[in-house]
Amino acid sequence: MGIRVLKGGMLTTVQDLGRTGYQSQGFGVAGVMDVRSFKIANLLLDNPENEAVLEFTLMGPTLQFTSETIIAVTGGDFLPHVNGKPVSMYTAIYMHKGDVLEFKGSRTGSRGYIAFSSYLDIPVVMGSRSTNLKCSLGGFKGRRLKDGDYIGFRIKRRYLPYFLSRTLDLDEFDQEEVTLRLVMGPQDRAFTKAGRETFLNEEYVVTSDFDRMG
C-alpha cells in the first residue's frame, strides 16, 4: 500500500513546512520552497495543513501506485499524465492500483508538489518529515528519491465529499515572467560598485550542480 518510484526525477524529496527550533544547533529548517502550492495541494484533499508531500524540481518523478488513493498535483505545470493520458493540475485525481503517474515536461515554474490522501509513511524527525539534504536528515532516508524506492502509505484511501468539485482554475497561477527581488545586506559594501552592478544585471544559468540553496 504505497508508491514505487520508477524514476526519481532530478530532485524529488519529501517535504512539509519544515523543521523549526533547531537552527541554533546547526540544523536548517528545510521544508517546501513554495508554501502556497503546498497548502493548496493538501487543501484539495482535506489533508492536515502540514501533511508531507513530494516536492520535485525541474523534472518530475514517475510513480506507480500499489494501492488506490487520491492525489493532487500543484506548483508549476509539468504536464502530468496518468497511464499516458494527460490529467489536470490543481484538482483531486483518483489513482487505482497499478496506475502510473509521470510528467512530460515543464511548461511553467520550476517546482511541483504531489499530495496524497493516504499520507506518506515517513517518520517524524525533530518535529518534521522534511528532508534536509545537507544533514542527510528526515524525509526518505535523508536523501532525494531514487529509481526503485518504495514509500508506503499510513492509512487507506479516505472518502472525499464533493470529489468532482475539488479543482481550481490553473490560469490563476500562470506566470510568464517572475520578478526576483532582493534586499542588499550589510556586507554589500565589501564589493565594488562595478561588482554590485554585475551582480544585479548579469544573466544567470542554472546548471546540474544546483540544489535547494542555489
Predicted segments, located by residue:
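Conserved "landmark" site that anchors the functional core of diverse proteins
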Residues: 1-214
